[in-house]
Amino acid sequence: TRTRYPHGDDPAALARHANVFDEDAAPYWPRWRPQAAPGHDGHAFTAPVGRYAPNAFGVHDMLGNVWEWVSDWYAEEGYAHSPQDDPQGPATGQVRVRRGGSWHTWPLYARCAFRNWNTPQTRYTLVGLRLVREIDPPQSPRPRGARR
């Protein structure tokens, strides 16, 4: 996308689109209350999958709920010399990238473009993964009377 978030650039709209650190979660971490997104997404911790509207590609939960591990290894200057489209991370490394933010993420970091990282052994209640199943595209119907 060309905007900060799939729904646009306004962090105040996050509560309608993603489960991030907002006014529902802030009471559990009073020290971080000033960082909370305005509004209520209805969940202080994880939310049921698919609770929020899909993005323009029809994919749910690309922001918030849990950080998602991605296959890239992290490198501080990883994108400095990479192509703009489909950049590839380093072939090896010490820490893996996670993206999208979680229920405990401030709006600044709840973006698909923001890269966070941890060692592959890291286990948190706010980190997960996305399972993907490839499916065949639907067959177009044959015109009446067409032979197989």
Regions found by a protein language model. Give the residues of each.
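Functional-site microenvironments in short loops/helix caps that host divalent-cation chemistry
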Residues: 1-116, 120-125, 132, 147
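Short beta-strand-to-coil "C-cap" segments at the C-terminal boundary of structured domains/repeats
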Residues: 131-138
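Short catalytic/ligand-binding loop motif for oxyanion handling, primarily in non-cytosolic enzymes
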Residues: 14, 140-141
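Short, acidic Gly/Pro/Ser/Thr-rich loop/turn segments
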Residues: 105, 138-139
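Low-complexity, Gly/Ser/Thr/Pro-rich intrinsically disordered linker/tail segments
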Residues: 143-145
